[in-house]
């Protein structure tokens, strides 16, 4: 699934230049690049602000402006490395390609807290994932989920439309990398229960549930 900036509709109407500026990040971050940036922070212990700014510099973006006035908008993030990096990039791009002053509010503990902060206006935008948007924010029904889940673009379009309709928030264009959920299982258990895919796991759990019902 895609990662993209999620912005309050009210904020975007007031400052449409935000959308124009952040469109510059469209497709700029591949899976490999995102993994490398996370590595620099988690393993090399480099500050997310430094890693984000140096990455944007390498791409040729302007990064020298660092405003210190009263904030026009507030960028938020959840409380893990990838979010810190993306939020720092949003700040750099907005401050260097608009005349807006930006504050940063990081470490929001989870999707519901971050999204509620967005709705209340405590923050104006934050990085979010379309898979999370589909399942946690929109809470899509099972039939619709099964119809669109195999297509990243269909998920993006559905989440974008429903988010605007229900909450007046806008999904901007994707950063580029694919963010999906995965499951880890001990090798001996995969062999023991003949599980090599999520479908196998679902079948195993369904059978287990049926046995418990007997």
Description of each model-found segment:
Residues 14-52, 166:
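Periplasmic-binding protein-like
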Residues 19, 26, 49-56, 84-91, ...:
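Extracytoplasmic/secreted envelope proteins and their assembly/folding machinery
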Residues 53-75, 199-213:
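Immediate post-signal peptide segment of exported/extracytoplasmic ligand-binding proteins
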Residues 12-16, 42-46, 50, 80-88, ...:
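Soluble non-cytosolic domains of exported or imported proteins
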Residues 8-12, 27-31, 152-214:
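A conserved helix-loop-strand patch within extracytoplasmic ligand-binding domains
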Residues 68-83, 100-107, 210-214:
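Short, well-ordered beta-strand elements
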Residues 23-31, 57, 61, 95, ...:
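Generic secondary-structure signature for well-ordered alpha-helical cores
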Residues 85-188:
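Short, glycine-/small- and polar/acidic-enriched structural segments
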